[in-house]
């Protein structure tokens, strides 16, 4: 059953290297009425970061308590730190009817959809595998085996992308951002679930 306000929830996902963060940043820059969830993390605050703006900074104990109490809707562990989405962050947007984007890994997207069937999942595709490989290499930070692993994972994720409500191809960032914007506009214009 859909909770009221679930139509304001948008999950953007896709393989590593598709540029989903860049596309969402572009979208938020052009359309300030749309927001993005602020993730919770246990990593140390960096200089210039603001608690509650860049991240909600939690201790490992706080994060694990929130997790145990069901107050974190999806999370991942990266470089020995937790990153996750707070339930309160999602619910606030639903209550206030503010369209909100969660940019998350493919594995986390299914969890959100199960929790909020009224949410919209959007899969960001690379133009093709060659381009994805080029983008992963362009970063110049990863070892060859890491790149190969990510490409294999991307193929698996793309193969499973049929489960998503919407698909967009990130060829030109601006175009892709506007495509997502029109998906959001169309969805929030639909009548509320009773």
Task: Give the role of each language-model region.
Residues 2-7:
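Phosphate-binding P-loop
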Residues 9-11:
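Short hydrophobic/aromatic beta-strand immediately N-terminal to the Walker A/P-loop
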Residues 14, 19:
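Conserved glycine(s) of the Walker
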Residues 21-71:
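N-terminal phosphate/diphosphate-binding loop that engages ATP/GTP or pyrophosphate donors
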Residues 37, 56, 120-122, 166-168:
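Hydrophobic/aromatic beta-strand patches that form the interior of the parallel beta-sheet core
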Residues 61-71, 85-140, 184:
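ATP-dependent NMP and nucleoside kinases share a basic, alpha-helical "lid"
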Residues 73-80, 138-145:
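Flexible beta-alpha connector loops of hexameric P-loop NTPases
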Residues 118, 134, 138-142, 156-194:
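NTP-dependent small-molecule kinase module
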């Amino acid at each position: 059953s859909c909770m009221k306000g679930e139509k304001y929830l948008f999950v953007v996902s896709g393989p590593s290297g598709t540029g989903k963060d860049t596309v969402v940043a572009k979208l938020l820059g052009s359309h300030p009425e749309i927001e993005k969830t602020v993730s919770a993390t246990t990593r140390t605050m960096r200089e210039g970061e603001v608690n509650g703006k860049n991240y909600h900074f939690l201790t490992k104990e706080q994060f694990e308590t929130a997790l145990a109490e069901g107050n974190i809707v999806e999370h991942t562990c990266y470089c020995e730190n937790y990153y996750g989405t707070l339930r309160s962050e999602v619910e606030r947007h639903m209550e206030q009817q503010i369209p909100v984007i969660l940019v998350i890994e493919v594995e986390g997207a299914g969890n959100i959809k199960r929790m909020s069937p009224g949410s919209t999942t959007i899969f960001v595709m690379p133009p093709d595998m060659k381009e994805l490989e080029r983008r992963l290499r362009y970063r110049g930070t990863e070892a060859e085996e890491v790149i190969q692993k990510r490409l294999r994972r991307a193929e698996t994720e793309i193969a499973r992308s049929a489960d998503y409500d919407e698909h967009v191809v990130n060829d030109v960032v601006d175009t892709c951002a506007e495509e997502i914007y029109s998906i959001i506009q169309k969805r929030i214009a639909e009548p509320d679930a009773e």
